[in-house]
Amino acid sequence: MPKHLLIVESPAKAKTINKYLGKDFTVLASYGHVRDLVPKEGAVDPENGFAMRYDLIDKNEKHVEAITKAAKTADSIYLATDPDREGEAISWHISEILKERGLLKDKPMQRIVFTEITPRAIKEAIQKPRMIASDLVDAQQARRALDYLVGFNLSPVLWRKVQRGLSAGRVQSPALRMIVEREEEIEAFITREYWSIHAECTHPAQHFSAKLIKLDGKKFEQFTITDSDTAAAAQRRIQQAAQGRLHITDVTNKERKRRPAPPFITSTLQQEASRKLGFTTRKTMQIAQKLYEGIALGEEGSVGLITYMRTDSVNLSLDALSEIRDIIARDYGTNALPDKPNVYTTKSKNAQEAHEAVRPTSALRTPTQVAPYLSNEEHRLYELVWKRTVASQMIPAILNTTSVDLAAGNEHVFRATGTTVVVQGFLAVYEEGKDNKNAEDDDEGRKLPVMKTGENVPLERILTEQHFTQPPPRYTEAALVKALEEYGIGRPSTYASIIQTLLFRKYVDMEGRSFRPTDIGRAVSKFLSSHFTQYVDYDFTAHLEDELDAISRGEEEWIPLMKKFWVPFKELVEDKKDSLDKTDAGSVRLLGIDPTSGKEVSARIGRFGPMVQIGTVDDEEKPRFASLRPNQSIYSISLEEAIELFKMPRVLGEDQSQQVSVGIGRFGPFAKRGSTYVSLKSEDDPYTIDLARATLLINEKEEIARNRIIKDFENSQIQVLNGRFGPYISDGKLNGKIPKDREPASLTLEEAQQLLINTGKPARKNFSTKKTATKNETRKQTTKKRTTDAKATKKVSDKPVKKQIKKRIAPNITQ
């Protein structure tokens, strides 16, 4: 019988570690967090020292029971959850549960940590156990309590002032503010025209181009030329001065070193995976988790391929450095090795607990060697980690930049530049990605012919090119993570969840690979920025993260921090609940006056989303409403565009003596004839669709409905229907199966009733077009069903039944 119980978070991790430890250990998984705050008011009690009420997470109850059962017979217990605050908190919760159940009175329980899942790392960790770090647990609990108090108190204000179902998060809200402010910058941006001038030269060795840097004896700036006439005039002056050639006045060569990037931390891994692989932050972390926990490598079994992926550290262990340097010497030559290992310092504003960087557990496992055992995505991410790690310990690349100045007469000067790689160094393995390219990137790899001062170069032609300034780009995932990190907002474990929450809440949409705020997102951000300014302030949020870090280091206590935050926050929430209306909330924009009715026209966030409105609730007549079209926004729609929306519904004409119209409802555009409604296809525009197309869509729907009914039974709600997966029986409440050897159309009512009793399952939706059954028929069918249910209940009554507790729906509480 195993003597020791070791508890980790995931079953994959448990499987890998179990292979290393042998029969003396039982390795079980908690499957993540085992307890969470109860989802109702009072889970955090500020009046009682911020006491926190926890409950077991339903889906993990069985795993807690398995851990409890194993703990009863184990001689000792090791808590081996992840080496960060969340992992420390999970270990603490497990220890509290076992303590409450009286299982720790006569046996030791210790905490062990490791940042890679290898036999050496696991065995070393077991040899160096420690107690649970209360400082890390306090920091995690303070973060959880803050998130709860913000979400539970601020979200209901949004429900009342903006729209029901919204949520506000302590870290999510500043991230949303970043995206919204960037969108406002883009909208406010005024495009400016400017022109550049280039010279195309025909040197005997090769053609090359040079850009104008001096015009009429003055420095050529971006906005020196802003129209085509001025550009054409400058072109003529230069051509006349050049007389078919340019004179070389200066040649300079500069050598510079480009150093390799440090090995990955969480944020840089997410950024590079986004730039180079097109992965979302969520996908990156999911794949990295698999690589960390273990991949089956043939006869070698399950092996952890990378170190822990939630880290702020750029350090590499001495063993890892030695192995990496051996690989470099073997595959790239000793000339690619620096005299001593490269050492990096973190740029992160608040580095957490000391871990290693994200690296391969063994550099000897090259991407090519492990490729047969990995999926395509796993292989691409592993290759990224492997190359970045190896490159970080190689010599710098040496680049040579040549700059040549060429004169056209005495007043005009062009400059040609080119950069070539003299020594590849780390570039032989890896080159860091960029969000935006600059002029230096364009010059890189461009070679120039050998030229000397005093020579003349034949001029082929002078080119002018029109440009327009561009607004700042929207945030990509990589750029947003970088910005969050630079501001000190969030931590390695939260970047992916912040982004996921914004998308899930529909506060932002993805447009290509960039974030675009939705109208709901903008309304929420505007409301919070106007009325809860401090709590979406970047510096305030970053300072709060600093204080949480200080708690994790034992430098501050968590309860004083909670008091300092809670008292003014609660006062502000109570004040705003009573003092604001929806106009103050920033979700209403006045557009002007409707010329027909003379009433006020506004754009606003309504119950079902963005809309426009003619009139107000104070008018005698009820206001009229219209939904916005796709790609329209309440923040940019004009009065004319808004009035156009009220042309819905459009009457297209008549068909089968019934009016046919199109409109836009809660669920999108639709066509209607009589009592038949049909959603328009994505390619159909409700403002341009004609009668023929609308009639076709309606007829198609009615045809499907007609063909759906195989058989009706007189005086019965039961029907034999055609479904997506074949014929079936339904009474509108239950759906039953038809045996494959039975012809559906030949079923009798009694047979159909019996099939419903034997195979019936609750129907998702009642599509029946039949009238409601009479009271007698309903009573008759119900009696039969109840009899069957009673038998079934009696049969299983001796088995334990889990008590179901109905819980009040609580506001969403997010980061």
Curated annotation (Swiss-Prot):
One of its GO terms (biological process) is DNA topological change. Its EC number is 5.6.2.1. Its cofactor is Mg(2+). Residues 774-801 have a biased composition (Basic and acidic residues). Residues 3-119 form the Toprim domain. PROSITE patterns: TOPO_IA_1, TOPO_IA_2, TOPRIM. This is DNA topoisomerase 1. The gene is topA.
